């Protein structure tokens, strides 16, 4: 959402990192931020640290090359939301059986 609003990637990462609870992700995203500030592409930095599956890194690379990074990241976010929603439905069904 930040990128869609015109915020640059480094600023968006700076804003997002404090919202993350997982210390492993925080450490890796800080390293990604450093790599980007040193000139690496977002996709290359992500690929280095294995935060996302390779398929998502490739989608991000395509988004960077086509100038559509914001919409690609929105698609990835939606995909994760659907996955979490599906997982929650399974957990609720299992709990209802108890």
Kindly give the residue locations of the regions a language model identified.
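Glycine- and small-hydrophobic-enriched helix-loop-helix hairpins
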Residues: 1-94
